[in-house]
Curated annotation (Swiss-Prot):
PANTHER family: PYRIDOXAL 5'-PHOSPHATE SYNTHASE SUBUNIT SNO, PYRIDOXAL 5'-PHOSPHATE SYNTHASE SUBUNIT SNO1-RELATED
Protein name: Pyridoxal 5'-phosphate synthase subunit PdxT
Annotated residues for binding of L-glutamine: 47-49, 106, 134-135
GO cellular component: cytosol; glutaminase complex
GO terms of molecular function: glutaminase activity; pyridoxal 5'-phosphate synthase (glutamine hydrolysing) activity
Subunit structure: In the presence of PdxS, forms a dodecamer of heterodimers. Only shows activity in the heterodimer.
Length: 188
């Protein structure tokens, strides 16, 4: 059985756990370094990226997670998780886990009040998926080697080797396409 870690600090932790269970995988809440042991993949949920970044540094999780990513462990960042993984945050430097060759802009769609839901066609799935954007970032540039999986004017889902990033919250929908893609296609 595959074991998928979910960083349990902020965001839709419980919602991610439920999606993982629906797919027959075992969720593992990650709050400390020891929780990273024996994971097959890791999800970095949304929340506030600066606060999550401080948590990763203070707990020592940052270096451990980076090592696992460099070793090839699949990782998926949703919303703030995508910001954490970005090599370049527009006008702000890089994310705490700078492994994804994109430029991302924080809160690009506005405040909490500007949150929205949209159906977006995903060629890889050959279906439209529901996407929920809450204070979402916008991917403004992708480097060579980064595959754009879905777009809404600009990329909203990208894949670079073992790194998946979505600027929206798939865990808040009734669908399970993105979790299925991560668990069944990326996690070995």
């Amino acid at each position: 059985m595959k074991t998928i870690g979910v960083l349990a600090f902020q965001g839709g932790v419980i919602e991610h756990v439920k999606k993982i269970e629906e797919l027959g995988a075992k969720p593992q809440l990650v709050k400390k370094k020891e929780d990273l042991k024996d994971l097959d993949g890791l999800i970095l949920p949304g929340g506030e990226s600066t606060t999550i970044g401080k948590f990763l540094i203070e707990t020592g999780l940052k270096d451990q997670i980076l090592n696992l990513i460099y070793e090839g462990m699949p990782v998926w960042g949703t919303c703030a998780g995508a910001i954490l993984l970005s090599k370049n945050i527009k006008n702000q430097g890089s994310g705490v886990l700078p492994v994804l060759n994109i430029v991302i802009e924080r809160n690009a769609y506005g405040s909490q009040l500007d949150s929205f839901k949209k159906e977006v066609f995903v060629p890889r799935f050959n279906i439209a998926t529901e996407c929920i954007f809450i204070r979402a970032p916008r991917i403004v540039e992708v480097a060579e080697g980064v595959e754009v999986l879905a777009e809404l004017e600009t990329p909203i889902a990208v894949l670079q080797k073992n790194i998946l990033a979505t600027t929206f919250h798939p865990e808040l929908t009734s669908q399970n396409y993105w979790h299925s893609f991560f668990v069944e296609n990326m996690v070995k």
